[in-house]
Amino acid sequence: MTSPVLVDIREEVTCPICLELLTEPLSIDCGHSFCQACITPNGRESVIGQEGERSCPVCQTSYQPGNLRPNRHLANIVRRLREVVLGPGKQLKAVLCADHGEKLQLFCQEDGKVICWLCERSQEHRGHHTFLVEEVAQEYQEKFQESLKKLKNEEQEAEKLTAFIREKKTSWKNQMEPERCRIQTEFNQLRNILDRVEQRELKKLEQEEKKGLRIIEEAENDLVHQTQSLRELISDLERRCQGSTMELLQDVSDVTERSEFWTLRKPEALPTKLRSMFRAPDLKRMLRVCRELTDVQSYWVDVTLNPHTANLNLVLAKNRRQVRFVGAKVSGPSCLEKHYDCSVLGSQHFSSGKHYWEVDVAKKTAWILGVCSNSLGPTFSFNHFAQNHSAYSRYQPQSGYWVIGLQHNHEYRAYEDSSPSLLLSMTVPPRRVGVFLDYEAGTVSFYNVTNHGFPIYTFSKYYFPTTLCPYFNPCNCVIPMTLRRPSS
């Protein structure tokens, strides 16, 4: 709070009669000074003695009215004191206490209120720290000026963010319409064939649009509310700073706390691009393959991995539905001699019937999967297989393998009895592959589940002399292969 020196000075320049700062001070012979209006005959009658000679209201020393003289030194001190505590050109206005009718001259620090001397002695304020309003006015004036500066900077930042969000909102809406038109144009060509698929795609886009707009609008609404609250707070502070001392200090604790701790909450990341762009399929073919995929998925079996067939290079998940390559633990030419590779078989054995399972190969740069004869199992190192062209024969049907695979991140191959292996063309790289075994028909088919179930390759018209097992080889890629339930 204000220095005790100001308190002492104020006491020296306070009129003993009206208890206010001296106004046009007059001094008498004893040295005491009073306001001109308080000590002259036209002032307060209670201080006027008898005609002619009068006595000092403080020490009762007699004096002649004609001996009253202006005290310019005190007048200058009072003027300077007012400038220190209130600012140049400002005057205290007398405001009366609503409860006691006395002048509001004190400020209660604990309650942040302006009170009178009777309030100070009441039970409500007993024991509280009180100060003269002149002492605290300048301090709060400076504090509010700092708060105003900070809050106006926040207001400018809020205005910039508002413009930014509106721009993003417009940009987001502009992205929606051309994409919507493109989807509708593609599907209108075959409206009667695949109307259901079109509506599904439009619904997905609409949901993404609504989600994006909701995020943007929530950020915009939050910013509007923050801006409104900020402006109300700024208006309150400006009103207090421009008003009287009473208006400045009344209920000051609340506004002080709000202004000091107010901080603009900035929005989180706003959507800028579609997560995925629509690819128009060959609708006639898509309808056919979708029906085919739906048919084979009805033969789904819950395949699990057999840990007893897993190589030391591999780690299986506890549920035995995921396998991951962790690096070779055997080096040198002994790999081939010990028939060492990185494959694992399924626990299920198939000697009849139709069976289907799906494998997630997303983000893998190399993999091999399909079926193999149960009497074979792992036979050689994949690293050697990738480097030695003649090793392809080890994965051919004549060797008991009906498999396809990925090499070098983009080469998809079917390992037929021909040499070299058959290079496959993929318009959409498969993140999930479906495997369908029809034992009696002698076929093993592979489906690109990622691309609506389009066929990848089919080994057909084979005679399976032995029981078959699902075959999985994550190769030397650390990304796992995972067995999935259809549509999961």
UniProtKB/Swiss-Prot annotation:
Zn(2+) binds at C97, H100, C119, H125. E3 ubiquitin ligase that plays a crucial role in the activation of the IKBKE-dependent branch of the type I interferon signaling pathway. In concert with the ubiquitin-conjugating E2 enzyme UBE2K, synthesizes unanchored 'Lys-48'-linked polyubiquitin chains that promote the oligomerization and autophosphorylation of IKBKE leading to stimulation of an antiviral response. Also ubiquitinates MYC and inhibits its transcription activation activity, maintaining the pluripotency of embryonic stem cells. It is an enzyme of class 2 (transferase). Its EC number is 2.3.2.27. SUPFAM superfamilies: B-box zinc-binding domain (SSF57845), Concanavalin A-like lectins/glucanases (SSF49899), RING/U-box (SSF57850). Belongs to the TRIM/RBCC family. This is Tripartite motif-containing protein 6. A zinc finger (RING-type) spans 15-60. GO terms for biological process: antiviral innate immune response; cellular response to interferon-beta; cellular response to virus; free ubiquitin chain polymerization; innate immune response; negative regulation of DNA-templated transcription; negative regulation of gene expression; negative regulation of stem cell differentiation. Pathway: Protein modification; protein ubiquitination. Residues 282-488 form the B30.2/SPRY domain. Keywords: Coiled coil, Cytoplasm, Host-virus interaction, Metal-binding, Transferase, Ubl conjugation pathway, Zinc, Zinc-finger. The B-box zinc finger and the linker region between the coiled coil and B30.2/SPRY domains contribute to higher order self-association. It is found in: Cytoplasm. It comes from Homo sapiens. It catalyses: S-ubiquitinyl-[E2 ubiquitin-conjugating enzyme]-L-cysteine + [acceptor protein]-L-lysine = [E2 ubiquitin-conjugating enzyme]-L-cysteine + N(6)-ubiquitinyl-[acceptor protein]-L-lysine. Residues 134-248 form a coiled coil. A zinc finger (B box-type) spans 92-133. Homotrimer. Forms heteromultimers (via B30.2/SPRY domain) with TRIM5. Interacts with MYC. Interacts (via SPRY domain) with IKBKE. Interacts with VAMP8; this interaction contributes to the activation of the type I interferon antiviral response. Interacts with DHX16. (Microbial infection) Interacts with HIV-1 capsid complexes. GO terms for molecular function: DNA-binding transcription factor binding; identical protein binding; protein kinase binding; protein tyrosine kinase binding; protein-macromolecule adaptor activity; ubiquitin protein ligase activity; zinc ion binding. Pfam families: SPRY (PF00622), zf-B_box (PF00643), zf-RING_UBOX (PF13445). One of its GO terms (cellular component) is cytoplasm. The keyword Cytoplasm applies.
